[in-house]
Amino acid sequence: MLRIYIGPNGYGKTYAINSKIEELKKEDKNRKDIIILNSEIVFADEMKDSVNNSFVMEYLIEELLENDDINTAKNNYEKLIDKNVEENKKMYNDIMNEVLSLNNQQRKKDVIDTTSSKEHKKLIKINSDDLKNSMGSGQKLQFLLKLIEKSNKKYIFLDEPENHTHPSLLHITAGLINKLSIDKDVCIATHSPELLSLLNIDFNELYIFNDPNYGNPKKINFNDAVSISKSIHLDNLNNKSKTYYNALSFKKNIIELHKKEFFEAIFSKKVYMIEGINDLLFLKSLLVKNLEQYNQYSIFQCYGKPHYLPFINVFEQLGIEVVPLFDIDDKNDSNNVLINEEIKKCKKYLEFDDNLENELNYLGKKTDTTAFIEFLDNFNNYKKYSSIFDGSDENV
């Protein structure tokens, strides 16, 4: 099982991980089936040759080296220690009694006693030449994940694993996390859309933290997202577009067609929604002309206007502003008109009469991307569409 907490830093992801760990410890305070890799692992500490639970690498290696013979020997050794303690209690108590009697004091407890929390220290040494000199932090993380895979740990908590991994190795880290989640309960906190796009996503286990006031995490309600006005007739849509209005197939479409862009959008404060490549090129030019290209936003391509509505519903559930750009298209098609009206319920939008190319008076072929880019370079009426960037209620 893979549970995922996503959101910016400082919005409660790490707190949620720690709370989950505390819940598990309430079930058994001495449990040893939990392991956490924090966002700030100091890999130099992992090279030390003293056994300490904070040194994850050595702790895992020691656990993997254990077998029945070693455990039997440990148990016999601990029993022998307990026996020796019991046999020598009286001697230590007598010494304490003698010293206390000088001041007319009395001993309240045994001086020594057996303990159930025995520790075995300095059992192994990790030769750190390769770990220190040859491996980067991403490789060291992957080494730890492989050790965890072979260990008896059941609950794995990973706090921002992307912090340790170079982008070129992120797919390897993601693959190891996916493999871990087959037989173990893995909980990961991340603010990386790139990592999310590489993970096996179960939307039922996806929690979105985007409330700066530490509100409860949000979950996407896909049944609500695919619910639209009954006046829109799905039978009039093509077969692929119909799949965007069923919760299961909508999730499948996100994973297969929109995964990386979808998670980038979830991390955004504003999403510009578009249909195709010409919309994308126009929007990028419009952003640059209005000096908006450095603001926090994402561009989400839906591959068809009928697909807008469920995505608008998802993003608005999460408190993300949606600004759709769309063609008016056929005004005699009642279904198309109704879809347009639903899209226009967004606070800001751009609608093109009857399509973007006609609106801009572009006379070339819609499919000639190079010609369209050249046309945009010489287009001089971007100001007409700048209202989507201001605070007014005006739309174009």
Predicted regions and their residues:
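Short, polar loop/linker segments at the starts of domains and inter-domain junctions
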Residues: 47-60, 216-220, 365-370
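Non-catalytic alpha-helical coupling and interface elements of nucleotide-dependent molecular machines
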Residues: 22-25, 42, 61-66, 182, ...
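Extended helical coiled-coil dimerization/tether regions that scaffold
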Residues: 54-155
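Switch/communication elements of ASCE P-loop NTPase nucleotide-binding domains
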Residues: 1-5, 10-12, 17-23, 123-256, ...
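Charged, low-complexity surface segments at secondary-structure and domain boundaries
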Residues: 63-86, 220-223, 231-234, 345, ...
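A generic structural signal for short, solvent-exposed coil/turn residues
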Residues: 29, 116-118, 159, 178, ...
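A generic structural signal for well-ordered alpha-helical segments enriched in polar/charged residues
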Residues: 22, 94-102, 179, 289
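Acidic, Mg2+-coordinating catalytic modules of nucleic-acid enzymes
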Residues: 2-7, 11, 18-28, 33-37, ...
